[in-house]
């Protein structure tokens, strides 16, 4: 009863915006990355490992070549210095590659770890360390900046003052994203089960990995914006030039918090109902 009441309230408030336009065209679904012109994809072999290698290379080229925000939403990583943002995304890709290799070896060594539940639990357990390693790589293991009268290690400071174990419920399902790479499982695309090396399946897997990459970078980026306020030198090193001012940094954080609440309280319930 309560859920139905909430649904009716949301439709009454927002229904005219969503349902009341005759002949309206649906908005195009945006990808965090601009798609390169054409979809020329070459695979060394027709298996999950080769598909992952192709996706890995495509995303590395996209990140290295520079990204533009096509999500229609404000992103925390846009507040980072362009070089730090690029280093963070590349570090996450490298960590994902290392995790896939580890999962593949673990599954070969133990049949028990091949179940969907074991895969999901193992994947979730590896996320905090994956984020920590990517953060350290982005910050620079040996970079030290003035803090008062002393030099302080940037990576150590960030690890001590960030929370990297938060759970994002919008992250892709581990089985859907990982199983085709690990076990050569087929991919469900528009009601069809396709092999992972089919171009349609490959592009869907690339979208899932892109989603994971950007959302994980967002978790880290939000934490970074929160720890830079009291350390001017860290702001100059990590953040975009426009956010060196504490006032501008706080304004961006407030805007991101407002956007997050809007998505959690309004947009997500509407999608669920």
PLM feature spans:
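Polyanion-binding and phosphate-handling cores
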Residues: 1-69
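Long, charged low-complexity terminal regions
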Residues: 92, 99-273
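Eukaryotic N-terminal intrinsically disordered, low-complexity segments enriched in Ser/Pro
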Residues: 74, 83-95, 99, 106
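Alpha-solenoid helical-repeat scaffolds
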Residues: 79-82, 86-89, 113-116
């Amino acid at each position: 009863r309560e859920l139905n009441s909430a649904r009716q309230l949301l439709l009454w408030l927002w229904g005219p915006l969503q349902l009341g336009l005759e002949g309206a065209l649906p908005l195009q679904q945006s990808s965090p990355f601009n798609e390169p012109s054409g979809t020329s994809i070459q695979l060394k072999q027709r298996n999950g490992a080769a598909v992952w290698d192709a996706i890995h290379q495509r995303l590395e080229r996209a990140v290295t070549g520079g990204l533009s925000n096509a999500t229609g939403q404000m992103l925390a990583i846009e507040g980072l210095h362009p070089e730090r943002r690029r280093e963070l995304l590349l570090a996450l890709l490298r960590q994902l590659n290392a995790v896939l290799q580890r999962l593949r070896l673990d599954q070969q060594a133990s049949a028990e770890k091949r179940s969907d539940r074991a895969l999901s639990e193992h994947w979730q357990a590896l996320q905090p360390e994956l984020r920590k390693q990517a953060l350290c790589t982005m910050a620079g293991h040996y970079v030290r900046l003035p803090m008062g009268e002393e030099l302080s290690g940037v990576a150590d400071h960030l690890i001590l003052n960030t929370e990297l174990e938060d759970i994002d419920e919008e992250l892709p399902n581990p089985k859907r994203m990982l199983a085709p790479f690990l076990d050569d499982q087929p991919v469900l695309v528009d009601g069809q089960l396709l092999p992972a090396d089919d171009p349609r399946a490959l592009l869907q897997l690339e979208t899932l990995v892109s989603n994971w990459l950007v959302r994980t970078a967002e978790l880290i980026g939000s934490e970074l914006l929160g720890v830079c306020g009291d350390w001017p030198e860290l702001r100059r090193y990590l953040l975009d030039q426009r956010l060196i001012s504490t006032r501008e940094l706080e304004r961006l954080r407030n805007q991101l918090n407002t956007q997050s609440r809007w998505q959690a309280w309004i947009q997500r319930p509407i999608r669920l109902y």
